[in-house]
Amino acid sequence: MSIQKSTDSSSLAEVIDRILDKGIVIDAFARVSLVGIEILTIEARVVIASVDTWLRYAEAVGLLTDKVEEEGLPGRTEERGAGLSF
């Protein structure tokens, strides 16, 4: 039985391609306080992904719905459109 060593190493291009394909989220929260008094708070969320990956995620969680149209004034827009003809 022989043992084979794997010498496959990922190139930088392969690593970047995988990150853009799968996406990565870095969520950081830091708070600095002195004697119970909050001096500084930092909240950061960094998302690294391709546009295609983000759009697939946004569609899955419902971030792409147009709430402005649903909450708008549909009666007012219909009144304006009634006087116009093309």
Swiss-Prot record:
Species in which this protein is naturally found: Priestia megaterium
Protein's recorded name: Gas vesicle protein A1
PANTHER family per record: GAS VESICLE PROTEIN A1, GAS VESICLE STRUCTURAL PROTEIN 2-RELATED
One Gene Ontology term, aspect cellular component: gas vesicle shell
Annotated InterPro entries: Gas-vesicle_GvpA-like (IPR000638), Gas_vesicle_GvpA (IPR047870), GvpA (IPR050530), GvpA-like_CS (IPR018493)
Function text: Gas vesicles are hollow, gas filled proteinaceous nanostructures found in some microorganisms. During planktonic growth they allow positioning of the organism at a favorable depth for light or nutrient acquisition. GvpA forms the protein shell. It is not clear if the 2 type A proteins in this organism are functionally redundant.
Family: Belongs to the gas vesicle GvpA family.
Taxonomic lineage of the native organism: Bacteria, Bacillati, Bacillota, Bacilli, Bacillales
Swiss-Prot/TrEMBL keywords: Gas vesicle
Domain of life (superkingdom): Bacteria
Oligomer status and interactors: The gas vesicle shell is 2 nm thick and consists of a single layer of this protein. It forms helical ribs nearly perpendicular to the long axis of the vesicle.
GO molecular function, one term: structural molecule activity
A Pfam family annotated for this UniProt entry: Gas_vesicle
Deletion phenotype: Not essential for gas vesicle formation in E.coli.
Subcellular compartments: Gas vesicle shell
